[in-house]
């Protein structure tokens, strides 16, 4: 009778390998988790289901259409980049974000690297300029160090940097005019993002970078536009917003505002590539009633026939401007319309301004998120 030596050896080795019991595996896992927390601090490792801070909460942008496109608003504890051509509404968008944070009891800071902040305009948008922290740094290193220290304090809820293009490295400022400084700003941004991103997530502070557009030289095919400061910000940003001016609003020959279109070029916390449109009125900022009227018309709450708008069978205004004026004068009807619009969106209505994408999921997500004030969260 022949015996297979190899099979006998393999069966013997298999019998020697004793798998740990489920209880022993759990003990080993708890032991290593405890050791990691002792070495690196509490919260350094956790189960995703147990981590309440992993839940991404949001705060409003100031434009209802943009809130829906973002899945609820700006995410807390993330990096946001807003870019676009000149006079497209970038600073206005961030000033509204600051006003929303302050309205909820939060602390806001504005790093004015361009030295162009208009306090009168900011106040007209609802910003509490008495309590707004403002810094006008001399160099890019100084600006980003200030941002890092504000974020580390965990006492600030939003920091706006205006803008990345104005963050000039110290070597460039101290050098002669015409000296080459290839890649110095990109290196500065790359180092800064590596340093502050982790602290942003831990503190819950939202950092919004404004950025300008440049043209790539020698690009024949494709989009020649690019943003300043290299690629680091593109990678570290959870949300990137591309804002454009698509129309100038006029009454006769008088220009009183612009129509802005925002494309969500990147979004790590909600579906990307949605589009939102809203009016920006000179001296007054984003028209919240204009956003409400647009969504009310899209969802069928307000009916438009020709130039006339009607609500519950009654004509409320001829033309868009007159209808917005009617909404301003009838706050009770305005609140009713807003409630109906939100209900329609939750039920699954589609909005063409957002690329015909159903926004029910975004509205449901926004409705489920707890309305906790920023002050109580900091406490």
From Swiss-Prot:
Keywords recorded for this protein, A-Z: ATP-binding, Cytoplasm, DNA damage, DNA recombination, DNA repair, DNA-binding, Nucleotide-binding, SOS response
Protein name as annotated: Protein RecA
NCBIfam families for this protein: tigrfam_recA
Superkingdom of the organism of origin: Bacteria
Listed GO CC annotations: cytosol
Major localization class: cytoplasm
Source species: Prochlorococcus marinus (strain MIT 9313)
Signal peptide: none
Gene3D superfamilies referenced in this protein's UniProt entry, alphabetically: P-loop containing nucleotide triphosphate hydrolases
A biological process from GO: SOS response
Compositionally biased intervals (Polar residues): 7-16
Entry's localization field: Cytoplasm
Entry-linked InterPro entries: AAA+_ATPase, DNA_recomb/repair_RecA, DNA_recomb/repair_RecA_CS, P-loop_NTPase, RecA-like_C, RecA-like_N, RecA_ATP-bd, RecA_C_sf
The UniProt record lists the keyword Transport: no
Residue numbers spanned by region Disordered: 1-23
Family from the record: Belongs to the RecA family.
Binding site for ATP: 84-91
Entry function: Can catalyze the hydrolysis of ATP in the presence of single-stranded DNA, the ATP-dependent uptake of single-stranded DNA by duplex DNA, and the ATP-dependent hybridization of homologous single-stranded DNAs. It interacts with LexA causing its activation and leading to its autocatalytic cleavage.
HAMAP family the record matches: RecA
A molecular function (GO) term: single-stranded DNA binding
